[in-house]
Amino acid sequence: MSLILFACVVRVRDGLPLSASTDFYHSQDFLECRRRLKTLALRLAQYPGRGSAEGCDFSIHFSSSRDVACMAICSLQCPAAMAFCFLETLWWEFTASYDTTCVGLASRPYAFLEFDNVIQKVKWHFNYVSSTQMDSSLGKIQEELKFQPPVVLTLEDTDVANGVMNGHTLMHLEPAPSFRMEPVTALGILSLILNIMCAALNLIRGIHLAEHSLQVAHEEIGNILAFLIPFVACIFQCYLYLFYSPARTMKVVLMLLFICLGNVYLHGLRNLWQILFHIGVAFLSSHQILTRQLQDKQSDCGV
């Protein structure tokens, strides 16, 4: 019997299944384990990155990072280090194939079902390739598990009904680890300073124009909004650079669009060089946001 029986990839924040292996095991115990895995997937955000839920015949292992988690049903004979090495390899394969925007925009279950081909390939590798060929990878995972043991549950702990777990009110455990970004660069700091300066200029001009327009006419409302909307967009660009946010690329494009349209609308109140300066800063900030990635270690568990 295989050590790794089933695997799936889910979105952490809501447990949406993104892909899964098309395995056909019809034993009652296995189907019950599948049901509990689905329940556990809905609560992954409550647990740290790695965890295991053990039952009488099968065990569930999960490993999550960013907004993607990989889960597996294994036989009890499967070593924990092998299971987590498998999950980490699967995670890297998935994130290399689909970016965070695709994952964040997924709206239906199994939107990436074609990834099953990769799951089967990785699963076959870990089930049938000699463990001596993976000694370095397994040894590294074993060391990590010693220093940071996974959360250990029972399969009964995963059964939740109406907010009650095993007769007790469901308590939220510590949240998933916060996302750590790459260090801020000198060019990134410059983009922040310029963005704050542009935001301040937009706010000052917008407030000044609003005070004047209240006494004169309502035709200036468009100009006021053309100052204030880019002000908000500049501040949000600073936030996107400093902190991780899902669907970051889409948000960056929207903020850049707001700033560009606002400045083009203000061509009568700003000269060409002022407009080019504001748009140039917006492009610089957008570039810095998209090039600053999450800090994460590379996996040694190759296929």
Curated annotation (Swiss-Prot):
Gene3D superfamilies: Longin domain. May be involved in vesicle transport between the ER and the Golgi complex. Residues 205-223, 270 are lumenal. Residues 8-119 form the Longin domain. Belongs to the synaptobrevin family. GO terms for biological process: endoplasmic reticulum to Golgi vesicle-mediated transport; protein transport. InterPro entries: Longin-like_dom_sf (IPR011012), Longin_dom (IPR010908), Sec22a/c (IPR043546). It is found in: Endoplasmic reticulum membrane. The chain crosses the membrane at residues 184-204, 224-244, 249-269, 271-291. GO terms for cellular component: endoplasmic reticulum membrane. It comes from Bos taurus. SUPFAM superfamilies: SNARE-like. Keywords: Endoplasmic reticulum, ER-Golgi transport, Membrane, Protein transport, Transmembrane, Transmembrane helix, Transport. SMART domains: Longin. It holds the Pfam family Longin. Its main location: endoplasmic reticulum. Residues 1-183, 245-248, 292-303 are cytoplasmic. It is a multi-pass membrane protein. This is Vesicle-trafficking protein SEC22c.
